[in-house]
Amino acid sequence: MKKIILCISALFTITSFVFGADSAGNRKDQMLRLGMKSGLHLMYLVSSPFVLEFPGEDLTFGLVYGSGDLVSTTTSGSSSTGYTTVEDKWTFTTTELTGRYYLGNSFNIPFGVAMYNIHKDDWTYSNVKYELDYNMTQLNFGIGNEWTYDWGGYLGIDWYQGGAKLSDKITVTRKSGTETSTTKTAAEQESTDIQAFGGALIFTFGFGF
């Protein structure tokens, strides 16, 4: 899926300057846009969110939502005792309210409020199993370009996106085992180390009506 997204983005980029000459006028003629978002941003890479936007000549507002799993494996042991492989699965969910303020035909300032969720069903520490649920709310801001083509398609590239954490909350639920203050502290620490998310070369592409 990621390769398909990158190939489509490359195709859009090649034709940006040819068919997106009047991006401002093309945006003005559209009522609704549907698309996808990806790039060098952990939440977008994992959740592959969909985009619903209401474009305008000077301002565009939108909604972003997606969910996906990040899976990793850890192998421990030795040739004499045998090897054990443990699979970790974290579910990442992206929800955003977004906007773009255009300073010309395509150059723009993207901004918005993001609500990110990271969930794990079975995190284990000292034989105590927990369910972790971490929620973060942050402000997003950046710089980018966006081209809207004569035939209805559009491509946005956010060259840089920063973030500022507004709030976060972790919910830790014991599922099995005997809980102690040490195990609970370890479970809570697992998620509260997370900082605001940022990224670069973030592609948004789709079609408008």
Language-model segments: residues:
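Cleavable N-terminal export/targeting peptides
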Residues: M1-M31, G177-T178, F209
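Substrate-binding/catalytic groove segments of enzymes
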Residues: W147-L155, K165-K169
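Hydrophobic, lipid-facing positions within transmembrane beta-strands of outer-membrane proteins
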Residues: L32, Y44-F50, T93-L97, T137-I143, ...
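Outer-membrane beta-barrel proteins and related beta-barrel translocases across Gram-negative bacteria
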Residues: T91, Y101-Y102
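Transmembrane beta-barrel strands of outer-membrane/channel proteins
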Residues: M36-Y44, L63-S67, I109-N117, I143-N145, ...
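Repeated loop/turn-to-beta-strand initiation elements of outer-membrane beta-barrel proteins
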Residues: D58-L63, S106-I109, D150-L155
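Short glycine/proline- and aromatic-enriched beta-strand/turn motifs that initiate or cap beta-hairpins
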Residues: G20-T84, I202-F209
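Extracellular/periplasm-exposed beta-strand and loop segments of Gram-negative cell-envelope proteins
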Residues: G25-R27, G39, Y65-T95, A114-N140, ...
